[in-house]
């Protein structure tokens, strides 16, 4: 199992939680972005820079992930593609995407997109707060305890 991070929009506080988790449980973590990322030195952490362009990081992740891998993303279409490939997706606010909730999330995303295009809604979600970071860390710990077998 491996953790992939859609790193272009991933908050730094979430990346720090992921770095600590990767070293603690000895799981491979790959950050994928269309800009240079300098992760901390570790045998378990690396970064891939993809060419700039629409969905470059998303496409790289979907192309390389294996069934059972975890992807950290707030991008709902990417999460849907991950689940379709039998991976797992967790957003930076600690919500685990599943086959059961994905249709609802896609519908809500499309609705909000239409509202933004019509000028009825502006802006995005509120900034990540301490509670969000704690929810993410707790969900990540639960997920890793259930799905990851550290090397001996």
UniProtKB/Swiss-Prot annotation:
Disulfide bonds: none annotated. InterPro entries: UPF0178 (IPR003791). This is UPF0178 protein AM1_1179. It comes from Acaryochloris marina (strain MBIC 11017). The lineage of its organism: Bacteria, Bacillati, Cyanobacteriota, Cyanophyceae, Acaryochloridales. Belongs to the UPF0178 family. Coiled coil: none annotated.
